[in-house]
Structure formats: structure tokens, C-alpha cells
């Protein structure tokens, strides 16, 4: 399951109408009382229910988008720095509608799957809202996919159309497509019949060039007629918020990715809740250096900005620390998103102190566990005093837990908050019983954001969402008497050494306090005597010289003997996904192989 730890510091407490209004202190006070009433604080069991009095919006994304445009058509909607593009909401709407009608002209129907395989660019943004307007289900495809992964993604959800970039970071997308489907060289672009991609009827290449068997993006937006405009309006009138609108492939550690299927209602409400958490208004500008294909950027970035009529600022097609801060300063951004490694890279820029980041105040940190020290630096050195802390996963659209501004600083940086509005959260043991307060167990959630299913995979859906509607995260957490949750690791990452349960996060947090350590990853490896032993991979800071024995001496006074790492390795980098998620299973495999080789040498 694709898990994100997203960092917030204000909970969603607003009164929603059909379209959401602004939050205020009065509604916050009411919500605080409601939380106390429905949960009977202090808690004795690890179950917490978010406020229920907040109505959910039942608008479709297209309907809501048009409402925002009508409200403030001349407001800045999107800036794509590397493409030199600046669009107002009225201009953005015009281009979205043109693409939507172009897709209709290609023959795309409501409910069909349209894949987008591209880094961040204006075409990605347009595709997101154009597909929503015609009721097509946008399928987000990882820009790092290789041919076999692309083939699996397209075929598993039966995509009828693929919108693709030409290349990205050394990957030639057009060449890969031709390797998968050599028929493209000779077939008619309007009548595709590809053996390896049997459901694919249209390939649209971003730009003005059309390779054999493909349409160009520019040609598609010039296809519509007056009839397609009438068709667009007719379709919009019959869409509803309960319909599927997005498929996100979860980055599982074993087997093929699963297609988490999300509705208009799922992701629009999640975006609105988080926008309120950030106190977002139409005056805000959010810098989004994270990849749009991921739920983090698509929902908490692009859609979040539209939910409030704010400006979405994209600094580049991929992350670069210097470019990101250049754009934050140049545009006067008020918010910045990123994974922990991005913020670390920004803080470590040699000219970091030369930047004027005074306009920043908030943002979301997500993708992997963030060291407490980094959080504090982001709050103080980057002026992001309202940096947000929350928790969820793709299957939750993606947020289910969120913290509050009036919490202690300690809670803001060490917990992932309490259940979001219209969400229940519980911690359970191996038998499914709710744990007592303070006892670790699996984090489960239930509510408005829970995905409908894994696309065309009933067995995996049932394995993840039980008969009562509870989503089982696979994460280990602990709840306190006020309902605040702390994530202590993954169930699969928990180490059992000689019968003792060891939580990697605890050891990692201790290592983060050692001078010269930039990052630490703790995982278990097989051991004949104890079942498992603790292994540590440590990333030194630039120019730091670390000594294994000195690190062990440091840990000796801070950890019980059974938590001490048996094996320590200093490494330059970790195996990670594009979104910054650690792949501990790869570390484990590599370490086991290394130790096995030593044993037989």
C-alpha cells in the first residue's frame, strides 16, 4: 500500500455549503466542542471519530471548477515556470474545455480510461480537468516506468487513450511505445490495433509533432466543432460526484501495482479539507515541485489550488532545489510542498541564506517519515510556521489524520494528528480488537475519503477494505488519550528479535540527533539465532566523516541492548521511489546478499 505521512498543523473545521466558504474562529470553536462530545475525552481505547457536522460537497470536479472560474475569472490560476506559461482562471478554463472537446472528438466516452504519462507541465494540468469534465477516468502513470510497467498499467485498467510526453530524464517514451507496439510505424492513427496494447485506440504526443500512429496534442485541441461543445455541456449535466474519476497506481513492494480507484467526491472533499487546514484563499500561491502523477501533487496541489481559486506554481518538470527556491522568491509563494529529501536539499543549498522566503507560511511535507529536526528547521529557517502535519495513503484520497494549530509544538512535529472530518480512525491488534490507549497496532480508517476499490481486483480490495468498510493501512501506530496518532512503522517493517518487538522509527529518531548524520534507515534482516537482527543504513552529511564505533557508543546510552543495530553501513543514497518513499525491501535484499557472500567467502 502506498503510504504517505503528510505534515499539517491545523485541522479542518468549517461549515460547508454546496460550494465551500471560508473558515472562521466560530466554526473552529464549535468543532472543538463537537470533538469532545462525540469522543468523550480522555480516551481509554484507541478509537477516534472526526467531526460529522460538516456537510460534504456533492459537486463534480468540472462543476466546481466552473464555479471557481465564474467567481474570479481574472485571478491567476497556474504558472508553469519552465514553459513560460501564466494563465488566469478564465484562460485556463478555455484551454481545459478545448482539450475536453478534443478528447470527445477523438471518440473518448465517459467512463473510459485516459492515461497520462508525463512529467509536470501545463498539458498534465489541462488533462486533469479536461478528463473530469467529460467523465473520463484519468490514469496517472509514473514517469519512471519502463516498457513492461507501462504495458501492465495500460492493460490492467484497459486504457483507451494515452497522452504522453516525448521523453523525460533519459527515457525516450516514443521509442518505448514503438518497442511495445512496432505496428505504430505503419498503422493509421485513427484505427489503432496493437497486439501488446489491445484496448488502446488513441496515442496523443504532447507538442506539435505527430509521430507515426500518434496524434499531436496541438492537433487534438484543434479538432472540436460546435457539436462537441454541445456534447460537453450535455455530458457535464449528467455526471455525479459518486462516479470514478481517477486511478492511482499504488507502489507496492511486491507484485504488480494496484489501481486505487477514486471518485470526484473522494478527492474534491479531501482537497477542500486540506485547503481549509492551510487557511488557503484566492490570494495564495502554492509552489508544487513534486510530481503530478502522485496523489500528493494531484489532489493536495493542483486540485487544492482550484478548490480555493488560488494559484498553482510549477517550478520545473522535475525537482531542483535551487530552481524551487528561485521560483518561491520570484513569485512570492505563500506555500511550498515537498518530500523530506526535497526540504533537506533546499536547506543545504550553499546560498540558502541569500533567499528571501518571507512570503512563505505553510505547506505540506509528505512521502516518507520526516526527522523532527528537519521539521523544526522548515518551521524556523524557511518561515513555514504553519507547515502541515497529517497522515494517510493513496487509498484515502489521500488524507485521514491531521493535527491542529493549538496543539503543543511537540505534538505538531511528532504526531500525525487526529481523524479528519467524516473519518474514523482506530488502532487494532492482530485479532482485530481495538487496542488500549498507548498500545501499538495497525492503523485503520473509515470514511468519506476511502477509495471505491482497486480497479478490477475484488480479492485485493477485500483484503484491504473489510466488510465493515474499514481500510487496513498496514501501518503501525499508537493513539494517545486525546486521539492523536503517532506512526511507529510498517507492520512488515517491525523487527522481532528474540521475541522483542522493535520499531525502526524509534531508532531512526535517535540517530537523527547524532552530529554528521543526514538520514537513517532501520530494517530487519534474517538471523538464525534471534529470528531477526537490526540493520542500520546511515547517510552522512556532506563532508562529514562518521565512525561506526563512535555511533555505537552514542547509541549505547540511548537504546535498550536488543535495539542496538547489529550491522551498520554508511551509504551515499537509498533505493527510493520517484516520490521519495524508501524501499526498505531492496535494502534488506542487498544486505542479506552481502552478508551471505561474506559467509561463503
What are these regions (language model features)?
Residues 221-222, 330-338, 347-411, 424:
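Gly/Ser/Thr-rich phosphate-binding loop
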Residues 73-76, 196-200, 204-211, 215-249, ...:
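Conserved pre-ATP/AMP-binding loop-to-beta segment of ANL
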Residues 86-90, 236-269:
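Conserved AMP-binding A3 loop
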Residues 39-45, 64-88, 210-211:
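AMP-dependent adenylate-forming
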Residues 24, 30-33, 106, 134-222, ...:
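Structural core segment of the AMP-binding/adenylate-forming
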Residues 268-285, 295-335, 349:
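Conserved AMP-binding/adenylation subdomain of ANL enzymes
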Residues 57, 74-129, 146-151, 216-225, ...:
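Conserved AMP-binding/adenylate-forming core of the ANL superfamily
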Residues 145-155, 162-166, 336, 431, ...:
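AMP-binding/adenylate-forming catalytic core of the ANL superfamily
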Amino acid at each position: 500500500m502506498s503510504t504517505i505521512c503528510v505534515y499539517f498543523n491545523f485541522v479542518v473545521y468549517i461549515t460547508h455549503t454546496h460550494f465551500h466558504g471560508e473558515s472562521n474562529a466560530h466554526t473552529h470553536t464549535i468543532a472543538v466542542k463537537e470533538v469532545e462530545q462525540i469522543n468523550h475525552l480522555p480516551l481509554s481505547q484507541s478509537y477516534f471519530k472526526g467531526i460529522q457536522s460538516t456537510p460534504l460537497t456533492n459537486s463534480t470536479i468540472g462543476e466546481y471548477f466552473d464555479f471557481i472560474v465564474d467567481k474570479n475569472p481574472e485571478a491567476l490560476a497556474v504558472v508553469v515556470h519552465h514553459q513560460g506559461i501564466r494563465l488566469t482562471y478564465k484562460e485556463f478554463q478555455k484551454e481545459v474545455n478545448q482539450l475536453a472537446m478534443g478528447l470527445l472528438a477523438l471518440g473518448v466516452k465517459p467512463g473510459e480510461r485516459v492515461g497520462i504519462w508525463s512529467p509536470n507541465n501545463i498539458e498534465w494540468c489541462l488533462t486533469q480537468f479536461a478528463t473530469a469534465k467529460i467523465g473520463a477516468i484519468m490514469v496517472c502513470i509514473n514517469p519512471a516506468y519502463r516498457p513492461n510497467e507501462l504495458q501492465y498499467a495500460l492493460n490492467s485498467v484497459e486504457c483507451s487513450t494515452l497522452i504522453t510526453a516525448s521523453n523525460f530524464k533519459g527515457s525516450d517514451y516514443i521509442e518505448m511505445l514503438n518497442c511495445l507496439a512496432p505496428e505504430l510505424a505503419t498503422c493509421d492513427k485513427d484505427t489503432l490495433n496493437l497486439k501488446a496494447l489491445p484496448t488502446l485506440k488513441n496515442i496523443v504526443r504532447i507538442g506539435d509533432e505527430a509521430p507515426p500512429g500518434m496524434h499531436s496534442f496541438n492537433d487534438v485541441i484543434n479538432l472540436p466543432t460546435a457539436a462537441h461543445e454541445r456534447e460537453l455541456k450535455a455530458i457535464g449535466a449528467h455526471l455525479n460526484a459518486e462516479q470514478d474519476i481517477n486511478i492511482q497506481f499504488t507502489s507496492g513492494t511486491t507484485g504488480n501495482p494496484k489501481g486505487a480507484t477514486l471518485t470526484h467526491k473522494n478527492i474534491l472533499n479531501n482537497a477542500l479539507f486540506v485547503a481549509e487546514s492551510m487557511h488557503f484563499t484566492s490570494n495564495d500561491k502554492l509552489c508544487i515541485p513534486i510530481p503530478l502523477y502522485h496523489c500528493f501533487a494531484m489532489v493536495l496541489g493542483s486540485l487544492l489550488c482550484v478548490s480555493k481559486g488560488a494559484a498553482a506554481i510549477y517550478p520545473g518538470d522535475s525537482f531542483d532545489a535551487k530552481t524551487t527556491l528561485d521560483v518561491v522568491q520570484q513569485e512570492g509563494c505563500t506555500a511550498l510542498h515537498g518530500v523530506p529529501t526535497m526540504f533537506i536539499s533546499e536547506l543545504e543549498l550553499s546560498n540558502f541564506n541569500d533567499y528571501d522566503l518571507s512570503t512563505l507560511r505553510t505547506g505540506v511535507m509528505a512521502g516518507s517519515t520526516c526527522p523532527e529536526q528537519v521539521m523544526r528547521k522548515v518551521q524556523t529557517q524557511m518561515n513555514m510556521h504553519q507547515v502541515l502535519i497529517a497522515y494517510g495513503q493513496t487509498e484515502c484520497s489521500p488524507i485521514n489524520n491531521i493535527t491542529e494549530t493549538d496543539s503543543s509544538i511537540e505534538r505538531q512535529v511528532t504526531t500525525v494528528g487526529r481523524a479528519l472530518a467524516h473519518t474514523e480512525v482506530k488502532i487494532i491488534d492482530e485479532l482485530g480488537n481495538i487496542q488500549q490507549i498507548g498500545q501499538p497496532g495497525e492503523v485503520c480508517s473509515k470514511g468519506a475519503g476511502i477509495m471505491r476499490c482497486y480497479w478490477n481486483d475484488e480479492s485485493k480490495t477485500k483484503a484491504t477494505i473489510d466488510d465493515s468498510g474499514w481500510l487496513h493501512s498496514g501501518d503501525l501506530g499508537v493513539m494517545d488519550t486525546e486521539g492523536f496518532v503517532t506512526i511507529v512503522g510498517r507492520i512488515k517493517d517491525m523487527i522481532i528479535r528474540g521475541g522483542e518487538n522493535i520499531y525502526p522509527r524509534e531508532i531512526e529518531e535517535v540517530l537523527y540527533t547524532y552530529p554528521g548524520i543526514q538520514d537513517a534507515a532501520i530494517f530487519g534482516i534474517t538471523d538464525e539465532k534471534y529470528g531477526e537482527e537490526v540493520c542500520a543504513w546511515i547517510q552522512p552529511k556532506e563532508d562529514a566523516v562518521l565512525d561506526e564505533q563512535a555511533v555505537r557508543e552514542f547509541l549505547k546510552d540511548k537504546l535498550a541492548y536488543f535495539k542496538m543495530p547489529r550491522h551498520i553501513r554508511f551509504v551515499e543514497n537509498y533505493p527510493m521511489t520517484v516520490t521519495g518513499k524508501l524501499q526498505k525491501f531492496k535494502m534488506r535484499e542487498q544486505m542479506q546478499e552481502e552478508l551471505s557472500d561474506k559467509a561463503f567467502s
